[in-house]
Amino acid sequence: GGFYISRYNISKSSAGKPQSVKGVMPWVNINFDDAKKVASTIEDNEAVKSHLTFGAEYDSVLKWFIKTEIKTLAEIAEDSTEWGNHWSTENSPKKVVETGSREEWCANNIYDFAGNVDEWTQEQNASSFRVIRGCNFYQDGFYYPVAFRGYNNPGYFYYGTGFRATLYIK
Protein backbone atom coordinates (compact mmCIF):
# COMPACT_ATOMS: atom_id res chain seq x y z
CA GLY A 1 0.00 0.00 0.00
CA GLY A 2 0.85 3.66 -0.09
CA PHE A 3 1.01 6.30 -2.80
CA TYR A 4 3.20 8.67 -4.76
CA ILE A 5 1.99 12.08 -5.92
CA SER A 6 3.19 13.43 -9.25
CA ARG A 7 6.34 15.53 -9.03
CA TYR A 8 4.92 18.10 -11.46
CA ASN A 9 1.43 19.21 -12.41
CA ILE A 10 0.08 17.06 -15.20
CA SER A 11 0.77 18.38 -18.69
CA LYS A 12 -0.09 17.14 -22.15
CA SER A 13 2.57 15.59 -24.40
CA SER A 14 2.79 16.49 -28.09
CA ALA A 15 0.83 13.28 -28.71
CA GLY A 16 -1.90 14.46 -26.31
CA LYS A 17 -0.98 12.00 -23.54
CA PRO A 18 -0.88 13.03 -19.87
CA GLN A 19 2.57 13.33 -18.32
CA SER A 20 4.36 14.68 -15.25
CA VAL A 21 7.55 16.28 -16.56
CA LYS A 22 9.63 19.39 -16.02
CA GLY A 23 9.71 22.33 -18.37
CA VAL A 24 6.28 22.25 -20.01
CA MET A 25 3.09 24.18 -19.49
CA PRO A 26 0.67 22.50 -17.07
CA TRP A 27 -2.62 21.17 -18.42
CA VAL A 28 -5.17 23.85 -17.49
CA ASN A 29 -8.66 24.76 -18.70
CA ILE A 30 -9.80 21.29 -17.68
CA ASN A 31 -12.90 20.56 -15.64
CA PHE A 32 -13.09 18.13 -12.72
CA ASP A 33 -14.64 15.22 -14.64
CA ASP A 34 -12.05 15.40 -17.41
CA ALA A 35 -9.16 15.79 -14.94
CA LYS A 36 -10.39 12.72 -13.06
CA LYS A 37 -10.69 10.72 -16.27
CA VAL A 38 -7.28 11.78 -17.60
CA ALA A 39 -5.52 11.08 -14.29
CA SER A 40 -6.92 7.54 -14.25
CA THR A 41 -5.37 6.78 -17.66
CA ILE A 42 -1.75 7.51 -16.75
CA GLU A 43 -0.93 4.12 -15.24
CA ASP A 44 -2.89 0.93 -14.54
CA ASN A 45 -1.07 -2.35 -14.10
CA GLU A 46 -0.61 -5.11 -11.53
CA ALA A 47 1.57 -2.88 -9.32
CA VAL A 48 0.04 0.62 -9.46
CA LYS A 49 -3.09 2.53 -10.44
CA SER A 50 -3.25 6.28 -11.11
CA HIS A 51 -6.06 8.60 -10.09
CA LEU A 52 -6.84 12.25 -9.47
CA THR A 53 -5.48 13.16 -6.04
CA PHE A 54 -7.86 12.83 -3.09
CA GLY A 55 -8.00 15.59 -0.46
CA ALA A 56 -6.65 13.21 2.20
CA GLU A 57 -3.62 12.44 0.01
CA TYR A 58 -3.02 16.15 -0.48
CA ASP A 59 -3.17 16.63 3.29
CA SER A 60 -0.76 13.71 3.81
CA VAL A 61 1.79 15.38 1.53
CA LEU A 62 1.48 18.63 3.51
CA LYS A 63 1.97 16.73 6.79
CA TRP A 64 5.01 15.01 5.26
CA PHE A 65 6.50 18.43 4.41
CA ILE A 66 6.15 19.43 8.08
CA LYS A 67 7.39 16.09 9.45
CA THR A 68 10.53 16.23 7.29
CA GLU A 69 11.01 19.88 8.31
CA ILE A 70 11.18 21.08 4.70
CA LYS A 71 8.25 23.42 5.45
CA THR A 72 6.68 24.81 8.61
CA LEU A 73 3.01 24.77 9.55
CA ALA A 74 2.98 28.55 9.01
CA GLU A 75 4.36 28.16 5.46
CA ILE A 76 1.57 25.68 4.72
CA ALA A 77 -1.44 27.09 6.56
CA GLU A 78 -0.74 30.83 6.78
CA ASP A 79 1.52 32.09 3.97
CA SER A 80 2.91 30.09 1.05
CA THR A 81 4.10 33.14 -0.90
CA GLU A 82 7.81 32.31 -0.77
CA TRP A 83 7.53 28.79 -2.20
CA GLY A 84 5.07 29.19 -5.04
CA ASN A 85 4.25 31.23 -8.10
CA HIS A 86 1.82 33.80 -6.69
CA TRP A 87 0.90 37.33 -7.67
CA SER A 88 2.76 38.58 -4.58
CA THR A 89 5.86 36.36 -4.93
CA GLU A 90 9.11 38.28 -5.35
CA ASN A 91 9.95 38.51 -9.08
CA SER A 92 6.63 36.86 -9.90
CA PRO A 93 6.05 36.31 -13.61
CA LYS A 94 2.33 36.99 -12.91
CA LYS A 95 1.28 34.21 -15.26
CA VAL A 96 1.26 30.41 -15.47
CA VAL A 97 4.80 29.20 -16.15
CA GLU A 98 6.40 25.91 -17.15
CA THR A 99 6.46 23.13 -14.56
CA GLY A 100 9.50 23.07 -12.29
CA SER A 101 10.59 26.58 -13.33
CA ARG A 102 12.21 27.51 -10.01
CA GLU A 103 13.95 25.40 -7.40
CA GLU A 104 12.59 27.60 -4.59
CA TRP A 105 9.12 26.39 -5.62
CA CYS A 106 10.11 22.81 -4.79
CA ALA A 107 9.57 20.89 -1.54
CA ASN A 108 10.81 17.31 -1.11
CA ASN A 109 11.22 17.01 -4.89
CA ILE A 110 7.59 18.05 -5.57
CA TYR A 111 7.38 21.18 -7.69
CA ASP A 112 4.80 23.97 -7.80
CA PHE A 113 2.65 22.51 -5.00
CA ALA A 114 2.10 25.91 -3.38
CA GLY A 115 1.43 27.91 -6.51
CA ASN A 116 1.46 28.31 -10.29
CA VAL A 117 -1.88 26.58 -10.85
CA ASP A 118 -4.37 25.47 -8.24
CA GLU A 119 -5.38 21.82 -8.40
CA TRP A 120 -8.57 19.79 -8.67
CA THR A 121 -8.94 17.06 -6.05
CA GLN A 122 -11.56 14.36 -5.59
CA GLU A 123 -12.59 15.95 -2.31
CA GLN A 124 -16.20 17.15 -2.26
CA ASN A 125 -17.53 19.95 -0.08
CA ALA A 126 -20.95 20.00 1.60
CA SER A 127 -22.64 20.63 -1.74
CA SER A 128 -21.91 18.85 -5.01
CA PHE A 129 -18.93 21.12 -5.63
CA ARG A 130 -15.38 19.75 -5.85
CA VAL A 131 -12.47 21.08 -3.84
CA ILE A 132 -9.63 22.91 -5.56
CA ARG A 133 -6.45 22.99 -3.48
CA GLY A 134 -3.62 25.44 -3.23
CA CYS A 135 -3.25 28.70 -5.05
CA ASN A 136 -2.62 29.88 -8.58
CA PHE A 137 -0.39 32.59 -10.01
CA TYR A 138 -3.18 35.18 -9.93
CA GLN A 139 -3.76 34.86 -6.18
CA ASP A 140 -1.82 35.89 -3.11
CA GLY A 141 -0.09 33.12 -1.12
CA PHE A 142 -0.98 34.95 2.10
CA TYR A 143 -4.73 34.79 1.48
CA TYR A 144 -4.63 31.43 -0.30
CA PRO A 145 -1.86 29.29 1.26
CA VAL A 146 -1.26 25.77 -0.01
CA ALA A 147 -3.60 24.32 2.64
CA PHE A 148 -6.49 26.46 1.36
CA ARG A 149 -9.58 24.65 0.14
CA GLY A 150 -11.46 26.44 -2.61
CA TYR A 151 -14.33 24.81 -4.45
CA ASN A 152 -16.21 25.03 -7.67
CA ASN A 153 -18.77 23.34 -9.83
CA PRO A 154 -17.30 20.17 -11.42
CA GLY A 155 -17.95 21.66 -14.87
CA TYR A 156 -15.80 24.72 -14.16
CA PHE A 157 -12.56 25.23 -16.05
CA TYR A 158 -10.06 28.07 -15.79
CA TYR A 159 -6.62 28.92 -17.15
CA GLY A 160 -5.24 28.89 -13.59
CA THR A 161 -6.61 25.48 -12.56
CA GLY A 162 -4.86 22.18 -13.29
CA PHE A 163 -4.35 18.88 -11.52
CA ARG A 164 -1.94 16.21 -10.31
CA ALA A 165 -2.12 12.47 -10.45
CA THR A 166 -1.46 10.06 -7.62
CA LEU A 167 -0.08 6.55 -8.06
CA TYR A 168 -1.64 4.11 -5.64
CA ILE A 169 0.63 1.16 -4.89
CA LYS A 170 -1.44 -2.02 -4.95
List the predicted regions and their residue ranges.
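Short aromatic-cysteine micro-motif
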Residues: G1-D112
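Short hydrophobic-acidic sequence motifs that mark active-site Asp/Glu residues
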Residues: G2-Y4, V117, G162
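Acidic glycine-/aspartate-rich tracts in secreted/extracellular proteins
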Residues: N9-K12, Q122-S127, Y168-K170
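Disulfide-stabilized, aromatic/cysteine-rich ligand-recognition loop
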Residues: N29-E43, V48-T53, L62, S127-K170
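Residue-level recognition of short, solvent-exposed, well-ordered loop/turn junctions
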Residues: D112-F113, G160
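Active-site-proximal beta-strands of protease catalytic cores
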Residues: A114-Q122
